[in-house]
Structures are given as C-alpha cells and as structure tokens.
Amino acid sequence: MIRKFSNGYELNSKILDGINKLADNVATTLGPKGRNVILFHKEQGVPVITKDGVTVAKFVELEDPFENVGAQIVKQAAEQSATRAGDGTTTATVLTRAILQRAQKYLTAGVSPIEIKRGMDKASEAIVDKLKEI
C-alpha cells in the first residue's frame, strides 16, 4: 500500500489548491449571470447540464489526495448550507475560499491558527448581530 504524507506549508497549500479548484468550478454558476455547466455522469453515461452549484460540487473529485481533502471538506459544508437553507451552496463555497485564502496569508506570516479562529468567531458574532438588527 502506498501512502502519501505531507505537512506544514506544503499541506496547507495543497488543501487550499483543492478548495480553489472546487470554488473555480462552482463559481461559474453564481448569480443571475451564472453559466450552465456540462458534467458527464459516469454511471448513466450521459451529460448533465446544470446551473446548480451543489450539483457541480457533487461531481468534483480531485486526483491529488490532499487537494481532494480540501475540496471534500468545503463541499460538505456547502451541502449543509443547501440542506438547511435550500440554497447558498455556491456562495458558501466562494466565501469559504476567500476566508481561507486570507487565513493562509496570516498563517504564512506566523500568526497562530488559534488566533485566526478567534478572529473568525468574533467576526461571525458581529455579522449575526447585524443580521438580527435588520
């Protein structure tokens, strides 16, 4: 059995690459000017045409195992958005990518991941408070 190992910056970079690949594929469907995507359904042997981000995300499987981990984690989170709200998969994926790209810059600069998480939690609370005011 062949096993792959990676750590540190290389691992973070690979995971973020996977998230970027997922987000690039899903982002094309975003909004009213989003485009249709043609996917090939392996089981049925027919093409599928869709503008639904969650459907596009379901088809994303990456060859690199570390990239695939990143894509699968974000895909699961985005599917929860679709399950709970009925929509928002594409937006959740694109926002997650933006947040994690910014976090990667701070990690590279030496900021503690725990401090980054605390900052994200504070920002989340502030956003929820503002939304409750509306």
Language-model-detected regions and their locations in the chain:
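N-terminal glycine-/lysine-enriched basic segments
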Residues: M1-I134
